[in-house]
Structures are given as C-alpha cells and as structure tokens.
C-alpha cells in the first residue's frame, strides 16, 4: 500500500474517532502534512523542554536567532516539531475539557493537518510578552521577524483573516526552503 495513502487513511480514521467531520477541514483548504523523519534538537524552549526541527529548518532557526540577537532582539522557541500522536492527544484534552470541535479547530490543527508535523513550523516568543498570545505582535521580536524572517526563509502562516479559518497567530512561523 502506498505510504501516502496509508497516512491519509490514518488521518481520516483519527478524525472520525475524534468526532471531527472531514468536511470541516476540507472546507478550509487545509493541506495534510506528514511527519518529519529524524528531526534534530534545537535545544530547550523557554520552558526547559527539548524542541526539535527538520535539519535545514533547525540550521536557519539558529542563524536567524543569532542575527536577531546581534540586533538586540531575543527570539525564543515555544514549540517545534509535534508528532501526529501528540496532536491527537492535544485535541483529546481539549474535547475532554468541554470545548466544541468548532472551537478547537480554529485554534489547534487536527492530527495530520498541523504544520508542526513537518518539523518546519515553530511557535516563537520573547521575554517581552507571554507566549502564544496576540500581544506578541507588539514586540520588537515580531517587528524584527516581519522585516527579516523572510531573509532566513520564515513566514507567518496565519495572519489575520487567513484562508484556513485559523485564529490570528503572530507567533507561528513556518520555514520555506526559499533562501540561498
């Protein structure tokens, strides 16, 4: 059986098990993301947890972080690679807490649809604000990322009113292999 097809079957079954209608996802044009193989450590995040990224992304993250630091801006990792199972458990916890499927999928991607699976997505913060809040857009770190992130291949995926129906996430950046 084709690996890609098997993964898609796993995604559909998991969505069904979680009570997430596939139409809610496909209507938002969310692509399926397979897991990164062999993500590498980028050290610990701001909470002391080991974080991982895809190899080239990790290299560009370190380079970007060093350049920001040289400009007096501190970029901190909050969350990098997340496995399919991690994302499933995240959704299960939110369902158990009483959140509706609609509420959850505007904030958290269902398993199989998270950019974090690729090892190329990174939630970024700075000591200037609490992590994963819209307040991040008011920081020097966000301003620096808006001006310089593309120099290292990073782009914010979920701007205001994005096509995927995801809340505005100024902290969520994805590496696209478009730098020399």
Go through each PLM region and give its residues.
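Extracytoplasmic cell-surface/polysaccharide-interacting catalytic and binding patches
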Residues: 1-80, 84-180
């Amino acid at each position: 059986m084709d690996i890609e097809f098997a993964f898609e079957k796993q995604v559909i079954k998991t969505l069904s098990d979680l009570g997430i209608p596939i139409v809610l996802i496909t209507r938002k044009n969310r692509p399926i993301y397979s897991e990164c193989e062999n993500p590498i450590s980028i050290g610990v995040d701001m909470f002391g947890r080991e974080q991982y990224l895809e190899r080239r992304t990790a290299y560009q993250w370190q380079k970007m972080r060093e350049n920001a630091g040289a400009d007096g801006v501190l970029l901190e990792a909050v969350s990098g690679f997340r496995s399919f199972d991690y994302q499933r458990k995240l959704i299960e916890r939110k369902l158990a807490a009483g959140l509706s499927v609609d509420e959850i999928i505007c904030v958290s991607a269902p398993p199989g649809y998270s950019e974090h699976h690729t090892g190329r997505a990174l939630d970024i913060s700075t000591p200037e604000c609490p992590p994963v809040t819209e307040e991040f857009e008011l920081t020097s770190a966000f301003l620096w990322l808006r001006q310089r992130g593309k120099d290292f291949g990073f782009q914010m995926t979920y701007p205001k009113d994005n096509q995927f129906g995801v809340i505005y996430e100024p902290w969520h950046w994805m590496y696209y292999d478009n730098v020399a």
